Amino acid sequence: MPVNSFDDYYMSWKPDIKNATPPIYKALAEILENDIKSGKLKPGTKLPPQRELADFLDINLSTVSRSIKLVMEKGLLSSSIGSGTFVSSDADINTVILLENNNEKIIEMGAILPDVLSNKLLVSYMEQLVKEQGCEKYFQYSMPDDSKFYRETAVKWFNMNNLNVNNDENILFSAGGQNGITAVLASLFKSGDKIGTNKFIYPGLKTIAKMLGIQVIPIEEENNEITKEGLIYACKNEKIKGLYLIPDYSNPTTHSISDKGRRDIAEVAKSFDLIVIEDAINSMLKNEKSIPIAEYAKENTIYISSLSKTIAPGLRLSYIYSSRAYYEKIKTALYNINIAVSPLLVEMASRIINSRDLEKIISIRKKQIKDRNKIFNKYLSDYKVLGEEQCPFRWLILPEYFTGKSFELCAKKFGVKVYSSERFAVGGRKLINAVRIAVTSAKSNEEFEKGIKIIKNLLENNDEIDTLL
């Protein structure tokens, strides 16, 4: 029997396991998962202490702990040493944010897509490739790692991002950034491991971690930048194994890590032997390029640079720099996931990067981002918005009468797609009410301006919210 009486005692969750089928830890985990997914337990709800739950249910503490761990590995719970266990902020949100093409009337400002204008240049490269004698070889299995030309192209790309790579033997190729991150997590982490990151981060990391049973831990921040003290605390108390960061225009907060912050992260990584995954997805878009974290901690950092935001999203290719300590494991994971990346895409990317057209493509991208941000600022400069003129998305902090989720729903009802802060949240604490707005995804400047006007109208006419929802 329970030691204490719970008849008049408040608990945020009082599961009933009277009719549960053994093993009890699995049955309890299933009840907890169902209560979260059904909405009975809301995002941010703090669960009762595990000892309290064990007493209430009259079962062993270890049984409760095993149940909590199972649900945590599915990404539905988050915990912090000394703070307790919470229902994850994104537990009731779809974190898959790829473009949906099922409604042409919706103005796309959710998914981050570069313009299609410069794709015409890419088409000319493709046409030339398939007309060449012997082009059949690009449709065969091929290992780009074996090509010195491809490796040297990757080195050139890295050097353009201020990562000084002299040894082209540490280069790997993946079918896009998400593919590269998946390979790194699958090869260097195991179920139950913890990886630290920002309080709001790219949802793709969360979906991979959830699939692999890896717990994502939010690190203490100051002005959207991870603090050295917070990182040390997470290493000592949360026992994180690694760290995932987007150092330039972090998705979704738009923050770029300061040089001091990069040095601090590198210092802590070396001290605690952390695996740092540096996602350089936006680095090439910056006019003033910073020194990558990898430059300060090459032995601890895996640097992933995708071509999707700079050249084209359909060019599914990322260059990866890894120290020899991780190289073979990541290489094996990439082989198991892909066998190989497309030889056609690797050849095409190499030709573009080694041509004058690369600068032309990047210039087109940058100009469109700048032009769209001018339109954005024209209408929304009176609101709290993060993001500079070269950033391909903005982070709009909402007035208190909106949650991110409610604003996303309202905007969609008026024909504009944006993404709420709940989609990006890590952990179970109170959220900032915000939405991410992609500035380059609308089909034209006119369509983008129309979408921004709709957003401004929603912000100014909050008396219609209850009716809309």
What is each stretch, according to the model?
Residues M1-V130, F139, Y150, Y335-S342, ...:
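N-terminal basic, amphipathic alpha-helical segments
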Residues S78-S79, V165-N166, V418:
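Short beta-strand "wing" residues that participate in macromolecule-binding interfaces
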Residues D90-A91, E299, L307, S322-Y326, ...:
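Short loop segments at secondary-structure junctions
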Residues Y138-F272, I277, S283-N300, K456, ...:
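Conserved core of the PLP fold type I
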Residues Q178, R429-A434:
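A short, glycine/Asx- and small/polar-enriched loop/turn
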Residues I302-K367, E464:
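Conserved core segment of the aminotransferase class I/II
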Residues K366-N377, V385-L398, F407-K412:
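Conserved glycine-rich beta-strand-loop-beta hairpin in the small C-terminal domain of fold type I
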